[in-house]
Design a protein with these regions (language model features):
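Conserved acetyl-CoA binding element of GNAT-fold acetyltransferases
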Residues: 81-101, 153
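Conserved beta-strand in the GNAT
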Residues: 55, 63-73, 93, 98
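Active-site rim helix/loop that mediates acceptor-substrate recognition in acyltransferases
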Residues: 31-58, 76
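Conserved GNAT acetyl-CoA-binding A-motif
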Residues: 113, 120-132
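A short beta-loop-alpha structural element at the N-terminal edge
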Residues: 1-14, 25
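Conserved catalytic-core motifs of GNAT/GCN5-like acyltransferases
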Residues: 76-82, 129-135, 141, 146-155
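Conserved acetyl-CoA pyrophosphate-binding loop and the N-cap/start of the following alpha-helix
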Residues: 103-115
């Protein structure tokens, strides 16, 4: 497991495309456009620290990326977390948790997520959200994520 750099943008973009493809949410004709748009976003966001990413690799020589995960950081207004405590920003949005099919069901996603959560805790980030796929929901629940009342405008 290692922290990703701008040199890893092609792998990170590939994982994002593969994730949406595997969930059945990507029309084949959008694959190249999503790959380019993702790479363009990461080219700006990674150096600015607005997006953090990790790569899981096999033990080959040279190692091959077998999975990855990312976090988009966004500022939030301070708000009460409890009656006696404030929740300060930024908010971390976990994105693009992806494991290559041949490596699934071997604990790679859990290791990625524990790495992400440890890194965010070390930065003092209190609010962590994600959108769970059906395949990932049990893992996220085991890690302590709970359903919320968040809603989205359906346009």
């Amino acid at each position: 497991m290692r922290h990703a750099s701008v040199d890893d943008i092609p792998v990170l973009a590939h994982h994002r495309v593969a994730m949406f493809r595997d969930m059945g949410q990507l029309a084949p004709e959008l694959k190249d456009a999503l790959q380019r748009a993702t790479a363009s976003y990461l080219d700006d966001a990674l150096p600015r620290g607005e997006y953090l990413a990790w790569i899981a690799e096999d033990s080959g020589k040279p190692p091959t990326a077998i999975g990855g995960a990312g976090v988009q950081l966004r500022p939030i207004l301070p708000r009460p977390r409890t009656a006696a405590d404030l929740e300060l920003g930024p908010e971390a949005i976990v994105l693009n948790v992806y494991v290559e099919p041949a490596w699934r069901r071997r604990g790679v996603a859990e290791t990625l997520m524990r790495t992400v959560l440890d890194a965010l805790a070390s930065r003092g980030i209190q609010r962590i959200v994600l959108h769970a796929s059906d395949a990932g929901r049990r893992l996220y629940e085991r890690l302590g994520f709970v359903l919320t009342n968040e809603m989205r405008l359906g346009r």
